Amino acid sequence: MARTASGATRPSDLISWSRNGFIAYACPVQHSKDNLLLTYLENVNGNSWKLAEPQSISVKLENNFLSELALVEWSYLSTDLAISDVYGNFYILLAGIGLLEPGSEKSTVNSDSSGAASTAAASQNSPSYELTSYNHMEMIYRDIINQDPALPVNPGAAIVSFSWLNIEKVQIINKPAALVTLENQNSSNSPFVYTYGVNQFQPHGVTHPISTKQACVALRQNGQFTLYFQGEHKVEYHKTSVALSDDIVIITKASIGFTNDKQIVVTAYDSVTRNISTYSVTVDWGFLVESAKRQKVDPHYHTPKEEHKTPKLNVTRISASIPVPTFLAAAEEEGMDMDKMDVDADSEDGNQPSYQIGSLASIDIISAGAEKDSSLDILISYTFEDGSGIASSTIYRYSLSEESELISSAFGELGVRKNVTAPANSPTVQTVTLQDKLIRSGTIQSITTALSDYFILLYYLDGHVDVVDRNSMKIVNNSDDTNLPPKTISSIFDVGFNFPKIDNSSNLIMAVSPNLTSVAYADFKGGSTRLNLKVFEKEKYLGISPKELFATSVGFAFRHAYACYTNTCSDDLVALIQTEIVRLQISLQKTITDKPHNIEMIIKKFVESIVSESHKAINFQLDAFNKESVDKLLSNPPLQKLLSLQLVLGELQDKNSIVSDIAWIVLNLRSTSFGIMFSLSSIYRQISKKKPTEDSLQDSITRGECIMSLVGNVKWLIDLMVYINQELLQLSYSKQDSSNSKLTIKNSIALPIILSKVPRLFLMYALSSIGRTHEILKKLHKDLSEASKLFTPMKESLNRYFTICNNSPLTLSLFENFLRECDALITKEQSIRLAGKEKGYSLKVEQKLVCQGELTEDMEQIGKILIDRHAVNINRDMKVSDLYFYDVDWLDIGVNKRSARTSKGLSETVIYPSSQLKPKMIPRLQYSDKECIDSLRKIIISVDMNQITGKTDTSRNGTTNHKAAIANDKIAKLRKCTRCRSVSLVADPLVFDAPSTIGLWTMVFQRTCICGNAWVNCVS
């Protein structure tokens, strides 16, 4: 790859971390065959993480020239990736979609072409796409300025500043956790608690009028300002441009920001004229404004071509100034002309050197925040070096203000002295006003924002980072405050964490995670294409007291809540939690040497505190649901996120898998129930439109595929019911003497699942769904047979479905009745036992059942009643031996689970360094050396372990047809989950050669696993 020096490129521009967890970055190695790479954090074995091998995304010109990149930035939705090279060529890649080949329904995701990003935008016809994993990308837009670098290039075409626009969507952001001291300290294990809340904000800044569409703006060195925007439908981008000024020669430093009154503000430095100018740009969105209104009523509305009014840009200059001199005597600073963007400044220590040699370092605009009264900040940074060679940075903060349009400022001063003010209706003009300044030692390299622009990040040349609170303008990650507990918790720094130390930091590209809990970086002179990742390190509150541990758990819960509200991948947060658990364990081992059981209990309580506070932080109450709210639970993202967190943290316990097993079971009950109801609705809609006599072969194929897609999940659900009955049966046998039984009430999964409200509701809902499906399919079979329309696809699929149901040793309707009896009994018993208990006790009981798998004394008594009732029912209604010896090992849950034999529990290595040989990923539900259970479809699939544990796909790689793969004894192409290590086929294994656009229930999980984390496509 050819590389050229680009002074305008800042290291932070060359790497971007998406909310979906994918890190895109310019290749840090010179003369590489790649210019853009992609990686992500992935779970290796349940207790350790690693950054995946970097995946190549080659962004090339038509002549295959691989130019040096100057910009890499994900959009707010984290689906669109903006790329620019040093010649000013601009590209947009779309992640998570596969290009369908023209004239067919075959996806390029299934092909075996190279890793280069495909160029959908080059096609003459409008392309069609399908959803797929986020590590597959298609190029959907190119703005080529300099096609052949061998020819004379346009010197002013390079992009010097870029920004994505916000989206037209209501934003929910959690308020800082606030400390509440309890009046009666004996009422809780902790003498204090934290309360949580949220703010809901209307769309702010400048946005595309259509809420599902995106736009971005770019400024080139020649002053050309461009808006790239999507149309009213489809994903393709268009552009419109305007020149900021005719006076611009060459812009070398600039920034773009947004106000809450729909202004785009641009501040730019022209290195020839030495002017710092600020401009206001407004967007006339044309026909898209009316289209946005119409689409709220009719999502498919298309504006007639004759009404297409193209969006355009309007520019107004706000101010023009010159920067401070490069040579500055200390005494001169007081007398500076304010037009030179300086302010009076006395040395803080009174020992200011006699002179400073400085230069303009950067211009950064911090957009207005979500609050209505939030305003935009313009930061002008200078680097100075005194006579001793010591470097410092001074950041001047300016804001936009409205002033009366007077003839001269002298008249304004005269009016103030005479107590005369301008009329209320007098015209006003915008101006740039100095607010304050911040002086820091060291050289600031770049400035960005974090956590919805609430914090400003200052990146220094030596690799360290300062975090500045946007409101107070105070440094928050190097605070001397040691008060515990903190009055408020708004970041991980409030509970003692800080940025990790990084070696060889002078040539870094670095990105901070969207959660502000870890950093990814690479050395431009290190010779490796791999990134390194480090989570934040604990610097304060290093003790092991309950007060310190609880405050830390609140910090983690608050960050997890932010990830939930903003739909941000929290894998690095989970890795940080695991790192803190390891630190705590090592500290306890040094302190408590003679009581290892106490160490285990403290860590267990710490994990329980993190999970329960995470529930509280998003106001998710396990005891607040009933039969009428199950439909909402099926599509409840917070529940999915909380169970996913519990699943991973539960796997750290090497002696007890109950916590992770319960989370895994409920996640699967959720997806299985959804799949059954989705498919049932599809079948019912289809048969309600036609009489059986009108049924066609195509109808039979479509319906047959729909039924076949359910077979694995129905089998899983039935076998889960069998396992629950097996546990209840064993508990009944071992009730008198548990010494010979590995299973006890303490380690049972069946009892917490039945006794807890949410899992029990899911169980009952799933059983009811299977019952309804069974009845509809029986009637459909009868009607089609009588009409002589029972074609082969329906015949075979119905036969397969009924065979699975009929081979069960359990009569589902009887077990459903038993669950209903249990529900009534538990509700009655709890109402009696909870009488007189403190407020919130019911929630604590539910959290113990679901999050810890533990039974309180009252629940244990109710559990024993259920065991006795079950023993009576089972002996009366079924053949016990058939149930007892029925094989359900493939579920991999409970005291005899297979994966427990390979689990090592907590590992001291939480994140493997890039330089260290990393272990291969151990897939969840591995069935044999060459087979795994598809976690989504619950079917056995052939796998190549090298494919799962090795490299992954960036574009035009993904899956083959499952049927063809089996027939030819090939390995079907796969995807894996970055968090729970699940494996699944990318494409549905269609049995009857149905079109791929059939719309099965699995399409809801095309990008995300059942645990809520992202899939990644694996290379063939």
UniProtKB/Swiss-Prot annotation:
<comment type="similarity">
    <text>Belongs to the Mediator complex subunit 16 family.</text>
</comment>
<keyword id="KW-0804">Transcription</keyword>
<dbReference type="Pfam" id="PF20719">
    <property type="entry name" value="Med16_C"/>
</dbReference>
<keyword id="KW-0805">Transcription regulation</keyword>
<dbReference type="InterPro" id="IPR021665">
    <property type="entry name" value="Mediator_Med16_N"/>
</dbReference>
<keyword id="KW-0539">Nucleus</keyword>
<comment type="function">
    <text>Component of the Mediator complex, a coactivator involved in the regulated transcription of nearly all RNA polymerase II-dependent genes. Mediator functions as a bridge to convey information from gene-specific regulatory proteins to the basal RNA polymerase II transcription machinery. Mediator is recruited to promoters by direct interactions with regulatory proteins and serves as a scaffold for the assembly of a functional preinitiation complex with RNA polymerase II and the general transcription factors.</text>
</comment>
<keyword id="KW-0010">Activator</keyword>
<dbReference type="InterPro" id="IPR048339">
    <property type="entry name" value="Mediator_Med16_C"/>
</dbReference>
<dbReference type="Pfam" id="PF11635">
    <property type="entry name" value="Med16_N"/>
</dbReference>
<comment type="subunit">
    <text>Component of the Mediator complex.</text>
</comment>
<protein>
    <recommendedName>
        <fullName>Mediator of RNA polymerase II transcription subunit 16</fullName>
    </recommendedName>
</protein>
<dbReference type="GO" id="GO:0016592">
    <property type="term" value="C:mediator complex"/>
</dbReference>
<dbReference type="GO" id="GO:0045893">
    <property type="term" value="P:positive regulation of DNA-templated transcription"/>
</dbReference>
<dbReference type="InterPro" id="IPR048338">
    <property type="entry name" value="Mediator_Med16"/>
</dbReference>
